[in-house]
């Protein structure tokens, strides 16, 4: 557990609820993040603890939570990821992306596949000594892609179609749901 938990009580593992009254759902560009999220991105000390516990990174998926947080900082400051010296996203070379506060995050700063590689297990959040909420930022960006642009990965679209047709993401009828 995080060493800071003793000072502020236990951390919630719940995602922040979606504000359906907001003019835009989710986060499109770095400037759309809340001030405390931006402060968290800037507070990152690049210790790599999030990277070390990330199952997606360990499995070779195109996600590195440490680089993602650094990329959000690049997005707010403007510039490119060429100065990043750590491990990149597996399969995606460093130096391909540029960011600015009012520029769309996907695909200019981060690839959509990077966001969808996250399992939302929150291991990165639990390990972070700076209390950065990696998963909330990822989910906010996914919400924009899904709810504003209508973009979901292929598996996500199948699960949504199954929910509509059968009331469960596996696509099984209620009588056979337990037959796996």
Residues of each region from the PLM?
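Acidic, Ser/Thr-rich low-complexity segments on the non-lumenal side of membrane proteins
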Residues: 15-58
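Iron-sulfur-cluster electron-transfer modules
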Residues: 32-41, 67, 76-180
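Short, glycine/proline-biased beta-turn/loop segments that scaffold the active-site neighborhood
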Residues: 72-74
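Juxtamembrane segments of multi-pass membrane proteins
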Residues: 52-55, 63-70
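Membrane-embedded alpha-helical bundles of multi-pass integral membrane proteins
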Residues: 1-27, 70
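Charged, low-complexity, helix/coiled-coil-prone segments
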Residues: 8-18, 55, 156-166
């Amino acid at each position: 557990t995080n060493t800071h938990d003793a000072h502020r009580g236990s951390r919630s593992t719940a995602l922040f609820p979606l504000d359906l009254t907001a003019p835009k759902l989710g986060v499109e560009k770095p400037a759309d993040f809340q001030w405390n999220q931006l402060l968290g991105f800037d507070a990152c000390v690049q210790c790599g603890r999030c990277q070390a516990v990330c199952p997606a990174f360990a499995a070779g998926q195109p996600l590195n939570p440490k680089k993602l947080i650094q990329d959000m900082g690049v997005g707010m400051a403007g510039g490119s990821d060429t100065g990043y010296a750590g491990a990149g996203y597996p399969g995606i070379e460093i130096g391909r992306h540029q960011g600015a506060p009012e520029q769309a995050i996907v695909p200019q700063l981060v690839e959509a596949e990077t966001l969808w590689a996250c399992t939302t297990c929150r291991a990165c959040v639990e390990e972070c000594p700076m209390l950065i909420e990696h998963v909330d930022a990822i989910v906010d960006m996914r919400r924009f892609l899904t709810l504003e642009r209508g973009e979901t990965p292929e598996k996500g679209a199948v699960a949504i179609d199954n929910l509509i047709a059968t009331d469960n993401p596996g696509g099984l009828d209620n009588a056979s749901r337990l037959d796996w």
